[in-house]
Amino acid sequence: MKRRYSAALLAVILCVLIAAYNIIYHPVQSGVPVTSFPKVTHRILLVPLDSRPPCRTFVIDAARIAGCEIVTPPTEILDYYSQPGETEALQKWTMENIAGCDAAILSIDQLLHGGLLASREAKKTSEDADRLIAFLNSLHTAYPDIPLYAFNILPRILPPDSIDGRDEKKYLMEYSRLADRIDIATAPSEDELGELEWLRSVIPPESLTRYDLLFSENARLNKRLIELAAGGTLNRLVIGQDDGERYGIPNREKRELIRHIKTLKLDDENVFLTFGADEIALSLLAYIEAQRDGFSPGISIKYNSEATPWRIMPYMAATMETTAL
């Protein structure tokens, strides 16, 4: 019994000594309360590409680090996966909530189609596009001191999901690749021209028309947006290329837009063509914040091998070097 008592007493004494040692030699430092994020100093209105986290939540969180509050439309009027956003309500909300903001980042796909997925079906008419252009002009007229940063996405090479049939989609993809190769060829071969005609004959006419119309209507809209940038309605326009390949009709549209940009004598500060879609709003946020702070970051690229710059990665329409630069 005495041994148990002695052992317990010894354990208590050791605990007291250890506690005293820590208190004397390792005192707890008094903490200084800090805020989690900087104080909000400015606000940016955002109409996101769609409601997924990379397009909306990531932008909101990144902006808070810079002391910026992002104002976004209510989720009730935004897209929800395959359900398009309410475009008229979104335009109305934008007009009513832009006052007091220092800038606006606007997804054309959301304002016109109701999101990225809806834009791939392109159910909107030329008249709908005309009304959107009129809305952007009205927005700039009403708030001329608030810079508008808009972005639009080229249709991807993949046919819309509403076009059924594995063979039909396969032929459309082959048609798209071949049409682009012929467009850039100095002298296309008779075999290539013959194959293109054969593909046109085996693809159902309504599907071929819908596929071609995706790009022609998008090119028409992008040209008008480029002209808004030239005229000062848009402070900057970014055109992104989503899910591309080395050859495809999206590349042909891009070359057409580049010619239009050169005709208007615009530079990258007016209209910027890039690769990707989801990250464009974040990139525009970084651009706005860098401009605001007078910061110009320097970037150095180091490749893991000599062949890497010339590789074309899946879903990309250009080499790694072109994409990185």
Label for each model-derived stretch:
Residues 8-22:
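Hydrophobic membrane-insertion alpha-helices, especially the h-region
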Residues 1-5:
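Positively charged n-region of N-terminal signal peptides that target proteins for export
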Residues 22-325:
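An N-terminal assembly and electron-transfer interface module characteristic of large anaerobic redox
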